[in-house]
Curated annotation (Swiss-Prot):
Keywords: ATP-binding, Cytoplasm, Kinase, Magnesium, Manganese, Metal-binding, Nucleotide biosynthesis, Nucleotide-binding, Transferase. GO terms for molecular function: ATP binding; kinase activity; magnesium ion binding; ribose phosphate diphosphokinase activity. Homotetramer. GO terms for cellular component: cytoplasm; ribose phosphate diphosphokinase complex. This is Ribose-phosphate pyrophosphokinase. The gene is prs. NCBIfam families: PRK00934.1, ribP_PPkin.
């Protein structure tokens, strides 16, 4: 098995190759003057199985690059390709929200199913998207890695999900932290006032670990942090698998009172402090 890196996951691919005790295949990436993407497999390929690791932070570039890498590898005699897309782009457009919309991940699933033999990702936003694929679709969970990272940073914490849909993440983290877990519930007090508080637990005088699969604009989590602080919470650490963090998301979170924001290297950002390399190796 050879490990091939896309341009957006070079460090992560190196970590995976090292754990697998194999050399990272040399790939050249560049752009033509008109901005079209160029890839070239530089090393000689003497294996019929390849793993491409290419996260999809710059979504459209990553998708085209992956298609080109697959084509180049097939030409070099590779028979089986596993695509590891730690952050799988377009996964949130998993249904029609308005008439006439494309179901983006379904369209891409058809492409992936024709060019690779297996797809691996980490914490997809909705797991039912596996049904769009006609190849094995495997997903791993990086929440335990996030929980391990904060284990010595919090004192007798409670673990909170930002909503009921993320409760499973809180439950997973709570087992590692040996802590109680809950989710934040919104209660409308009036037409203009909403209260956000843990469903059953009391955050007063407690350290808090809030965990979700993705932080995008940071607005919802920042509001929750601010209200938890007002309710007497002590240290608050916010964590997510995919730190998309659009615009001033980090500023919102720190201004609201977060002590630290933690993410993984599925989506490289300044808070990507936890690697999913071991999770990927376990899935391979």
């Amino acid at each position: 098995m050879i490990v091939v890196s896309g341009s957006q996951s070079q460090n992560l691919a190196f970590k995976v190759a090292k754990l697998l005790n194999t050399k990272l295949t040399r790939v050249e990436y560049k752009r033509f003057p008109d901005n079209e993407i160029y890839v070239r497999i530089v090393d000689e390929i003497n294996d019929d199985e390849a793993v491409i690791i290419n996260t999809q932070k710059n979504q459209n570039d990553a998708i085209v690059e992956t298609i080109l890498l697959c084509d180049a590898l097939r030409d070099e005699g590779v028979k089986k390709i596993t695509l590891v897309a730690p952050y799988l782009a377009y996964a949130r457009q998993d249904k029609k929200f308005n008439p006439g919309e494309a179901i983006s991940i379904r369209a891409l699933a058809k492409i992936y199913s024709n060019i690779v033999d297996k797809l691996i990702t980490i914490n997809p936003h909705e797991t039912h998207i596996k049904d769009f694929f006609t190849i094995p679709f495997i997903y791993g969970d990086a929440v335990p890695k996030l929980a391990e990272y904060v284990k010595d940073k919090l004192n007798d914490p409670i673990v909170l999900a930002p909503d009921k849909g993320a409760l499973e993440f809180a439950k997973t983290a709570s087992k590692i932290l040996n802590a109680e877990y809950d989710y934040l519930e919104k209660t409308r007090l009036s037409p203009t006032e909403i209260q956000i508080a843990p469903k059953t637990l009391d955050a007063k005088d407690r350290d808090v670990f809030i965990v979700d699969d993705i932080i995008s604009t940071g607005g919802t989590m920042a509001t929750a942090v601010k209200l938890l602080k007002e309710q007497g919470a002590k240290k608050i650490i916010a964590a997510c698998v995919h730190p998309v963090l659009i615009g001033d998301a980090l500023n919102k979170l720190y201004s609201a009172g977060v002590e630290e924001v933690v993410g993984t290297d599925t989506y490289l950002s300044e808070v990507s402090k936890v690697s999913v390399a071991e999770v990927i190796v376990d899935l391979l």
